[in-house]
């Protein structure tokens, strides 16, 4: 089976995106005997749906996890819900803006992840990785991707979710901005631990069902 990881290319004034670096670091690794496949998404509304839908259909992963940058957040923040809504004052990398349109005209207004994010937050904090539950993935590309990930994962009875990360320390230092950040190594460790926890939790539930 496969774990499918999505990260994003740089966007707006951020010339490096830690989500891309995290996904590239974990790509082709093996976590609890599951192969990790990493894909970098374009920061373009018109392209991400086709990429996500195609990759999930091709790989039929046991878990699909999106990773995105949340400038201004100081902790790793697993997301609880994606909303069927697009609103962006800033355009995407192609200049496209939305002013309140739905992601999926026929879809639900909101979709909850089927990942136990509350327990995941506890696990990360217990392992010395600052984490906090988030109840809003925003209305930009990350929320857009999360909505599609969860919607598509449900079609295959698999797991789907999204985790936001802070800016990485090395880049924050280079641009000399006073902005919350975290070391890239800590974030990579946090995402790897997250995958391990999610897979272990899934296996426990399956074993309980069988017994």
Curated annotation (Swiss-Prot):
Keyword check for Lipid biosynthesis? no
| Gene Ontology BP term (one) | proteolysis
GO MF term set: pyroglutamyl-peptidase activity
Q: Which reaction does it catalyse?
A: Release of an N-terminal pyroglutamyl group from a polypeptide, the second amino acid generally not being Pro
Q: What is its EC number?
A: 3.4.19.3
Q: Does the keyword Glycosyltransferase apply?
A: no
The cross-references to PROSITE patterns, in alphabetical order and at most eight, read: PYRASE_CYS, PYRASE_GLU
Q: Which UniProt keywords apply?
A: Cytoplasm, Hydrolase, Protease, Thiol protease
The principal localisation class reads cytoplasm
What is one term from the GO cellular component aspect held by the record? cytosol
Compartments annotated for it: namely: Cytoplasm
InterPro entries of this UniProt entry? Peptidase_C15 (IPR000816), Peptidase_C15-like (IPR016125), Peptidase_C15-like_sf (IPR036440), PGP-I_bact-type (IPR029762), PGPEP1_Cys_AS (IPR033694), PGPEP1_Glu_AS (IPR033693)
Q: Which SUPFAM superfamilies match?
A: Pyrrolidone carboxyl peptidase (pyroglutamate aminopeptidase)
Q: Where is the active site?
A: 79, 142, 164
**Which NCBIfam families does this entry report, sorted A to Z?**
PRK13193.1 (NF009672)
Summarize the subunit comment: Homotetramer.
UniProt family annotation: Belongs to the peptidase C15 family.
Describe the task this protein carries out: Removes 5-oxoproline from various penultimate amino acid residues except L-proline.
Protein name according to UniProt? Pyrrolidone-carboxylate peptidase 1
Gene of this entry: pcp1
């Amino acid at each position: 089976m496969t774990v499918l990881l999505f990260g994003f290319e740089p966007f707006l004034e951020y010339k490096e995106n830690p989500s891309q670096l995290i996904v590239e670091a974990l790509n082709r690794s093996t976590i609890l005997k599951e192969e990790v496949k990493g894909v970098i998404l374009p920061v373009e509304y018109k392209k991400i749906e086709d990429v996500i839908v195609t990759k999930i259909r091709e790989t039929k992963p046991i878990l699909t996890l999106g990773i995105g940058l949340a400038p201004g957040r100081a902790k790793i923040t697993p997301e609880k819900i994606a909303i069927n809504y697009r609103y962006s004052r800033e355009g995407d990398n192609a200049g496209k803006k939305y002013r309140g349109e739905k992601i999926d005209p026929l879809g639900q207004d909101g979709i909850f992840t089927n990942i136990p994010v509350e327990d995941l937050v506890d696990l990360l904090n217990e392992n010395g990785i600052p984490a906090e539950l988030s109840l809003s993935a925003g209305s930009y590309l990350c929320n857009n991707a999360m909505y599609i990930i969860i919607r598509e994962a449900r079609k295959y009875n698999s797991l789907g979710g999204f985790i936001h990360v802070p800016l990485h320390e090395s880049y924050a230092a280079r641009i000399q901005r006073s902005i919350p950040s975290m070391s890239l190594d800590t974030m990579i460790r946090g995402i790897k631990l997250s995958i391990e926890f999610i897979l272990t939790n899934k296996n426990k539930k399956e074993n309980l069902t069988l017994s």
